[in-house]
Amino acid sequence: MTVKTEAARSTLTYSRMRGMVAILIAFMKQRRMGLNDFIQKLANNSYACKHPEVQSYLKISQPQEPELMNANPSPPPSPSQQINLGPSSNPHAKPSDFHFLKVIGKGSFGKVLLARHKAEEAFYAVKVLQKKAILKKKEEKHIMSERNVLLKNVKHPFLVGLHFSFQTADKLYFVLDYINGGELFYHLQRERCFLEPRARFYAAEIASALGYLHSLNIVYRDLKPENILLDSQGHIVLTDFGLCKENIEHNGTTSTFCGTPEYLAPEVLHKQPYDRTVDWWCLGAVLYEMLYGLPPFYSRNTAEMYDNILNKPLQLKNITNSARHLLEGLLQKDRTKRLGAKDDFMEIKSHIFFSLINWDDLINKKITPPFNPNVSGPSDLRHFDPEFTEEPVPSSIGRSPDSILVTASVKEAAEAFLGFSYAPPMDSFL
């Protein structure tokens, strides 16, 4: 009987693993797509648009052409549309100050590159964004929000720091800390899930970073494994602050529909006002994914996934009671009852799941990380996705034409922005 039971268990496990692999492959392909792109595709899907839940979420009654596909050309940007980089700007910096070595990340508006400063011999991650793409999607406010948040968080150990920024006629350059331990998403892809002690360590550092942002009245709104990096020692570093919302006080709310589909909180899906507890929902979703390998309510069918988020009970197996209690608190569908609704980070910090964490030691990086990326130096790119690193570096990003003044003052930025047509026509930057 024992032999038969073990054989049956092995067959079942193998079958389930095959199914899980298929789900993971589909999941990995879909989740890098931003929410705007997802909604754009959803709006063009006649079958999906007929689904009552989709109509409720997106407030559409029939398929419609997405705004970005409108054939009418956008008018030239007015001075009010110019991007002012503010006090982070370095008016003397220019692209030719850097050797751009490798592509290490991609986003909706540009790429992140490993670069070495020629004079300083220092390595940076340089985020290069296309102004034209930003204006086309009317995302200037998000770019400014990211810049503002970056200016505020340079002293926190678990938030990426901004060194300076500059611009050319058609691009924005943000010079950031270079973090080369890899995305948490990359490590989850390789290992599928983490043991509870490792997940606890990461969750604690993430919670510390979120608590710090909340203390500055900033709601992060886009926590997901792709935005969580590991440094060379294995500590967490949050990056990508484009969806942050500033000036949200303890009881303040906002209502913008944004985020990543797998991690949207119920109140966001309902298009109700939401507060900083949306970040604690996302922390719960990420912790769940670290323990189980997929987000808590994931489905390849997006409408079904949204219905799961809104209505399906949370299912938790094979974890400790303290982990179960924490996840039930963080993934509480009613935000007024969610863990963190009353005392924000202090509630998370004092939860029994984190009883083994010395928070002073954590913030001072005195706790040895459970995983060491073992990178040999800045040029060690083993933890970056080959999808990025094998892509050629666009030649245009390192050019500093003499005819273009690199600056960040309001008037000069306006002149540079209006002159972005200097970009080579063969440039395949985006």
UniProtKB/Swiss-Prot annotation:
Domain AGC-kinase C-terminal, chain residue ranges per copy: 355-430
UniProt xrefs under InterPro entries: AGC-kinase_C, Kinase-like_dom_sf, Pkinase_C, Prot_kinase_dom, Protein_kinase_ATP_BS, Ser/Thr_kinase_AS
Q: Which residues carry this modification: Phosphothreonine?
A: 256, 368
- Give the modified residues of type Phosphoserine: 74, 78, 396, 400, 421
Motif Nuclear localization signal is found at: 131-141
Residues that, per the record, bind ATP: 104-112, 127
- Quote the biased-composition stretches of kind Polar residues, using this chain's numbering: 81-91
Q: Which GO terms describe its cellular component?
A: cytoplasm; endoplasmic reticulum membrane; mitochondrion; nucleus; perinuclear region of cytoplasm; plasma membrane
One molecular function GO term is: potassium channel regulator activity
| EC numbers, comma separated | 2.7.11.1
Show the PROSITE patterns listed in the entry.
AGC_KINASE_CTER, PROTEIN_KINASE_ATP, PROTEIN_KINASE_DOM, PROTEIN_KINASE_ST
Post-translationally, this protein is described as follows, namely:
Regulated by phosphorylation. Activated by phosphorylation on Ser-421 by mTORC2, transforming it into a substrate for PDPK1 which phosphorylates it on Thr-256. Phosphorylation on Ser-396 and Ser-400 are also essential for its activity. Phosphorylation on Ser-78 by MAPK7 is required for growth factor-induced cell cycle progression. Ubiquitinated by NEDD4L; which promotes proteasomal degradation. Ubiquitinated by SYVN1 at the endoplasmic reticulum; which promotes rapid proteasomal degradation and maintains a high turnover rate in resting cells.
Active-site annotation: 222
Subcellular location, record wording: Cytoplasm; Nucleus; Endoplasmic reticulum membrane; Cell membrane
**Outcome of mutating residue 78 to A:** Does not affect SGK1 activation
* Stretches assigned to the Protein kinase domain: 98-354
Tissue-wise expression:
Expressed in most tissues with highest levels in the ovary, thymus and lung. In the kidney, expressed within glomeruli of the cortex, at low levels in outer medulla and moderate levels in inner medulla and papilla.
SUPFAM superfamilies for this protein: Protein kinase-like (PK-like)
The family assignment reads: Belongs to the protein kinase superfamily. AGC Ser/Thr protein kinase family.
> What is annotated about its quaternary structure and interactions?
Homodimer; disulfide-linked. Forms a trimeric complex with FBXW7 and NOTCH1. Interacts with MAPK3/ERK1, MAPK1/ERK2, MAP2K1/MEK1, MAP2K2/MEK2, NEDD4, NEDD4L, MAPK7, CREB1, SLC9A3R2/NHERF2 and KCNJ1/ROMK1. Associates with the mammalian target of rapamycin complex 2 (mTORC2) via an interaction with MAPKAP1/SIN1. Interacts with MAPT/TAU.
Function of the molecule: Serine/threonine-protein kinase which is involved in the regulation of a wide variety of ion channels, membrane transporters, cellular enzymes, transcription factors, neuronal excitability, cell growth, proliferation, survival, migration and apoptosis. Plays an important role in cellular stress response.
Q: What is this protein called?
A: Serine/threonine-protein kinase Sgk1
Q: Give the organism, scientific name.
A: Rattus norvegicus
